[in-house]
Amino acid sequence: MKIILSNRKPSESNHIWVSDISSIDLFVDDSESTEIIIDSMLTSFPYIELGSVLSKTVSKLRVNGRIIIYEKDIDMICHHYNKMGMGVQDINDLLFDTSGSIASVLNIETIVDRLKELGLTIEEQFINSETMQSIITARRSNNEN
């Protein structure tokens, strides 16, 4: 079973769309999903809740299942604002374009650290400098904490 967590309806037809993470238990049991995609949804939670949100999501992954996270990177946004002449309107467009309400900002290191704390193996991490989006792929192994 493949899941996509997103505020906007995805074009992926082979994934089950969950638009409200609090309802994920209705769609998938623990250790059932082979792949979970989180598309610009983590910032809709307060920063202090990031660990618990990721923990609940990761609990839905099978052993060897993977999670892919797309999230705007605040470090890259600040860099563009400072060095590239990005304006305040540009930042507002980036942060509030499709994410709905925003309760926190994140960078790639924060997300990677939380995933590692949950016992996941990071397979890939990079920042798309054009979209200023962190892209992280991690896998749940069978030797978790």
Regions found by a protein language model. Give the residues of each.
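Functionally constrained cores in energy, signaling, and assembly domains
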Residues: 33-35, 60, 71, 114
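Class I (Rossmann-like) S-adenosyl-L-methionine-dependent methyltransferase catalytic domain
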Residues: 1-28, 68-145
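A short beta-strand submotif of the Rossmann-like class I SAM-dependent methyltransferase core
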Residues: 34-41, 50-53
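A short glycine-rich, Lys/Arg-flanked "PGG" loop and its adjoining helix->strand segment in the class I
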Residues: 51-66
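A short acidic, Gly/Pro-enriched loop at the edge of an enzyme's catalytic core
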Residues: 24-38
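Helix-capping/helix-break motifs at membrane-protein junctions
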Residues: 46-47
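Short His-Asn-centered micro-motif
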Residues: 5-7, 39-40, 61
